[in-house]
Curated annotation (Swiss-Prot):
A lipid is attached at C324 (S-palmitoyl cysteine). The record marks A259, C260 as: Cleavage. Residues 260-288 are extracellular. One of its GO terms (cellular component) is host cell endoplasmic reticulum membrane. Ion channel, which might have a role in genome packaging and uncoating processes. Keywords: Disulfide bond, Glycoprotein, Host cell membrane, Host endoplasmic reticulum, Host membrane, Ion channel, Ion transport, Lipoprotein, Membrane, Palmitate, Phosphoprotein, Signal-anchor, Transmembrane, Transmembrane helix, Transport, Viral ion channel, Viral matrix protein, Virion. This is Polyprotein p42. GO terms for molecular function: channel activity; structural constituent of virion. Glycans are attached at N270, N281. InterPro entries: CM1, CM2.
């Protein structure tokens, strides 16, 4: 998660850069060591259209991610100038706290407790830039993320842990990640056409976000579109979860429980939850698989006991005849009256008579002239 927040804050820092340049830098950061080294070399040789501050910041980010990248004199001079007013005792204290922080959250809590000034933050950045091998990747990522967050904070108003631009960039990243997992989910939910349509929408939205990310006018529209796509992705993910519970309950219980089956379930659950963009960790996925497995076993036992009870009631206690009579009465409630009518019709045909009157009604008194007589 720390790496994703770093990417989001980096993208937020580059919101005023040309979309093609921003895409190239983010792709290099997420593309591995070789891609990042190539991008750092391009930045150092000023082959990318970046301003001086943007170029040095991106080089610092890339070197802290991959210490194999050689330092750039321009970035080192900028850091030395920013920390020139800091006392040596403060620098030693900061370095001790950084090594004791342990991880990304430790760096965050450290900065919040100390309420660091700009020169103190720059001292941390200078440490991870000049001596990256002395610190763990979590410390380096946490330091750079906090630094970028402070830089983004100066250009906008926000009160959350992630800057507003960083939060939007994080949502865009989640939409991109969801679009890559939709194809895997389509096979589980049986919604191939809907999944294909949703994937096209997410890809179009990602392209739109890439070109209009730095625009304050387009931000509300982008967030509304992202929210709509996230809702549909979440709905498909929930549907896939329901399908998975059914599959696990009725297919895995017919096979002996083994580690192979559990790993298969874990893979399905991880692929499914990638659509809702909140991936299970291994423990949660394992426990959820065991819960579904237990639910399937209980369901099978209940059905088996129910079938045995019904067989005993039918063969031993002779209740099936009564059930058949109840079913017959329920399906054809007027069968008795129909049999009586058929018998009466046959009797009349045999006697050759018309149907007798069922009520004793005397004829109406009319005269020969058709006048009613009282």
């Amino acid at each position: 998660m720390a790496h994703e927040i770093l990417i989001a804050e980096t993208e937020a820092f580059l919101k005023n850069v040309a979309p093609e340049t921003r895409t190239a830098i983010i792709s290099a950061i997420t593309g591995g060591k070789s891609a990042c080294k190539s991008a750092a070399k391009l930045i150092k040789n000023e082959h990318l259209p970046l301003m001086s501050g943007e170029a040095t910041t991106m080089h610092i980010v890339m070197r802290c991610l991959y210490p194999e990248i050689k330092p750039w004199k321009k970035a080192s001079d900028m850091l030395n100038k920013a920390t020139s007013s800091l006392k040596k005792s403060e620098g030693r204290d900061i370095r001790k706290q950084m090594k004791a922080a342990g991880d990304f959250l430790g760096v965050e809590s450290m900065m919040k407790m100390r309420a660091f000034r700009d020169d103190q933050i720059m001292e941390m950045v200078e440490e991870v830039y000049d001596h990256p091998d002395d610190y763990t990747p979590d410390i380096r990522i946490g330091t750079i993320t906090a630094w970028l967050r402070c830089k983004n904070k100066k250009s906008e108003r926000y009160r959350s842990n992630v800057s507003e631009s960083g939060r939007t960039a994080l949502k865009i990243h989640e939409v991109r990640k969801a679009s890559t997992a939709i194809n895997e989910i389509a096979g589980i939910t049986g919604l191939g056409e809907e999944a294909l349509s949703l994937q096209r929408q997410t890809e179009s939205l990602a392209i739109l976000c890439n070109h209009t990310f730095g625009s304050n006018i387009m931000r509300p529209h982008l967030e509304k579109a992202i929210k709509g796509v996230e809702g549909r992705v979440g709905e498909m993910g929930r549907m896939a979860m329901k399908w998975l519970v059914v599959i696990i309950c009725f297919s895995i219980t017919s096979q002996p429980a083994s580690a192979c089956n559990l790993k298969t379930c874990l893979k399905l659950f991880n692929n499914t939850d990638a659509v809702t963009v909140h991936c299970f960790n291994e423990t949660q996925g394992y426990m959820l698989t065991l819960a579904s497995l237990g639910l399937g076993i209980i369901t099978m036992l209940y059905l088996l006991v129910k079938i045995i009870i019904e067989l005993v009631n039918g063969f031993v206690l002779g209740r099936w005849e009564r059930w058949c009579g109840d079913i017959k009465t329920t399906i054809m409630p007027e069968i008795d009256s129909m049999e009586k009518d058929i018998a009466l019709s046959r009797e009349r045909l045999d006697l050759g008579e018309d149907a007798p009157d069922e009520t004793d009604i005397s004829p109406i008194p009319f005269s020969n002239d058709g006048i009613f007589e009282i």
